[in-house]
């Protein structure tokens, strides 16, 4: 594993290790996959404005999220069904997160139970949720998470319906029975045609979910609530108005609406609307420590890593996940040093130049 030097190499190992159905499920995006590619490429169009002759002999990457200290502004995004990638599933991912002193957001669609993840290691973790048509199911899971010591709820708000993921349709992707829901609802679908995941989502997810439901969620939990899946100023303002505790700028890993903007291109729009009132996080397309720096320079408090974590898990289990996080942290530390930023607070908007700024400078 010492010879693996970047996320792309982990992706190639994951492709070799996984059955095609599972690799395509993790890796694929919606329809033409334009946004999937753009999430990554948009980062590459942002250039640095490094400062020199700054004392960077000691680099401090540490920060906090909702008051919980983390070793770097790199957290684990919620991704579904980790046991499809590795037999130990979310438990392996959780242990790696704990070893790296960061926060894992456990997926509502996890293959290990909330209690199994909670008892696997001592760490701060959040729970991502969907709201089902059967609200009692969502409520039970939230209450179990609270009891198990989870520290926040992350409500995904961009899935009134599942996006059209053509690889899953072609592969007849199965939806396995998830242990969290045993005795509550059947999640298993083995389709003769189409995607089983889409079939399950259509039957279970509540398409009537609206801003007023933040109140309902507040009524069933005392935990902080973040909303994940915002891409516009308008929705950011509504989120603040609804009293949420944080926002994740996300296009669901480009798995929902193709031709949605790359998240890094709309981050500033959301940050300017929020005006520092609540934390803004970002996911989508982060593949390098340089990407982490760019997101922070444009106003994010932290980034969430999705697919790279699954690639590490599929390739090398817990050690693979840890290696992915450590690589990104190392790249980020180098970027801070070479940009003249000894601490997170030193990373500013002046340290990057966006594509729009480059074009304007040529006019």
UniProtKB/Swiss-Prot annotation:
Catalytic activity: a (2S)-2-hydroxycarboxylate + O2 = a 2-oxocarboxylate + H2O2; 2-hydroxydodecanoate + O2 = 2-oxododecanoate + H2O2; 2-hydroxyhexanoate + O2 = 2-oxohexanoate + H2O2; 2-hydroxyoctanoate + O2 = 2-oxooctanoate + H2O2
Protein name: Peroxisomal (S)-2-hydroxyacid oxidase GLO4
Lineage: Eukaryota, Viridiplantae, Streptophyta, Embryophyta, Tracheophyta
Entry keyword annotation includes Manganese: no
GO molecular function, one term: (S)-2-hydroxy-acid oxidase activity
Keyword Glycoprotein: no
Membrane-crossing residue ranges in chain numbering: none
Organism: Arabidopsis thaliana (Mouse-ear cress)
Pathways per UniProt: Lipid metabolism; fatty acid metabolism
Pfam families, per database record: FMN_dh
PROSITE patterns, per database record: FMN_HYDROXY_ACID_DH_1, FMN_HYDROXY_ACID_DH_2
Cofactor(s) the record lists: FMN
Catalytic residues, chain numbering: 252 (proton acceptor)
